[in-house]
């Protein structure tokens, strides 16, 4: 499965690099974490690690560009006994491993920092928003006091709206992003589409290369 994912990311980079002289292609490796609030106001924390992605940006104007990409991420969440996993509905366990394939489409409003004096070391600060489609592959490895289990589920999230702040330090090097993600519909590990009202706030730091 991972070979397929990485092959797809590589193909995306190749296609994007040859598609348009006005476009930019990049790929990167990120780590970070997410704090989640569900519809009932309950909070949980998820660690990301790693997230590998590729993206293609097309300049629409001096201040706007359009990002299309794909990413694969692995995340794990320590989960205490006596509770139910918020996505799968499985009994409580210790560690839940989850794989995601994501296709984001973001519209970025770019603020160039080339002439900002003390901020000259930054490439740009950007605010972005757009829809995102997630394919979810869950591998739950956990146990409680009575039994152990390993379970896999497949699903997708048909609609997520994402907004965030990106700070790119020294072009083509390090990037820092802060995102707020509101999931409306959820079909991950479920047979039918559920109406969701979950908020996710993520911080990511990583390395990106490209042109």
Residues of each region from the PLM?
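Flexible, solvent-exposed loop segments that connect beta-strands
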Residues: 34-45, 74-99, 135-157, 186-199
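Transmembrane beta-strands of outer-membrane beta-barrel proteins
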Residues: 24-32, 69-71, 128-132, 177-181, ...
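Short glycine/proline- and aromatic-enriched beta-strand/turn motifs that initiate or cap beta-hairpins
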Residues: 19-58, 208-211
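Ser/Thr- (and often Asn-) enriched beta-sheet segments in non-cytosolic proteins
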Residues: 20, 24-26, 57, 65, ...
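Predominantly the C-terminal beta-signal and adjacent terminal strand-loop region
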Residues: 69-80, 152-211
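Cleavable N-terminal export/targeting peptides
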Residues: 1-24, 210-211
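Gram-negative (and chloroplast) outer-membrane scaffold detector with strong preference
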Residues: 55-142, 201, 209-211
């Amino acid at each position: 499965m991972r070979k397929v994912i990485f092959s797809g990311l590589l193909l995306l980079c190749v296609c994007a690099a040859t598609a348009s002289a006005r476009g930019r292609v990049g790929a990167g490796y990120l780590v970070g974490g997410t704090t989640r609030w569900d519809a009932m106001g309950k909070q949980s924390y998820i660690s990301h690690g790693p997230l590998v992605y590729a993206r293609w940006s097309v300049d629409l104007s001096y201040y706007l560009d359009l990002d299309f990409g794909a990413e694969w991420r692995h995340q794990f969440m320590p989960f205490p006994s006596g509770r139910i996993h918020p996505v799968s509905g499985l009994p409580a366990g210790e560690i839940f491993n989850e794989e995601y394939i994501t296709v984001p489409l973001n519209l970025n409003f770019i603020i160039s920092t080339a002439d900002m004096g003390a901020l000259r070391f930054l490439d740009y600060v950007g605010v972005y928003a757009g829809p995102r489609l997630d394919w979810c592959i869950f591998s739950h490895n956990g146990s409680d006091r009575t039994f152990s289990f390993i379970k896999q589920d497949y699903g997708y999230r048909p609609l997520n709206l994402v907004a965030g702040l990106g700070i790119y330090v020294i072009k083509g090097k390090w990037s820092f992003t802060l995102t707020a993600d509101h999931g409306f519909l959820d079909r991950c590990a479920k047979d039918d589409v559920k109406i969701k009202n979950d908020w996710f706030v993520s911080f990511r730091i990583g390395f990106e290369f490209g042109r």
